[in-house]
Amino acid sequence: MANDCKCPNGCSCPNCANGGCQCGDKCECKKQSCHGCGEQCKCGSHGSSCHGSCGCGDKCECK
């Protein structure tokens, strides 16, 4: 289960739900619109639209 996508070395993945990076990669979650940040940043299980923007692993609200 993808949590905050942080590897032991502090790497964090830009696409959390998909494990978008591997440990040792330099990558980080960016604040962006909800639908662009993986399953963890979607509205329910469909994620068609959200209020505002959120980071990877954040929950967002349905419009």
From Swiss-Prot:
Which keywords does this chain's UniProt record carry?
A: Copper, Metal-binding, Metal-thiolate cluster, Repeat
- Give the UniProt record's GO annotations in the biological process aspect: cellular response to copper ion; cellular response to silver ion
Where are the bilayer-spanning segments?
A: none
Query: Could you cite one Gene Ontology molecular function of this protein?
Result: copper ion binding
Give the sequence repeat ranges.
23-30, 56-63
The record's misc note reads: MT-I might bind approximately 11-12 mol eq of Cu(+).
Could you say which protein family the record assigns here? Belongs to the metallothionein superfamily. Type 9 family.
Name used for this protein in its record: Metallothionein-1
Instruction: Report the source organism.
Output: Candida glabrata (strain ATCC 2001 / BCRC 20586 / JCM 3761 / NBRC 0622 / NRRL Y-65 / CBS 138) (Yeast)
Q: What gene name is listed for this protein?
A: MT-I
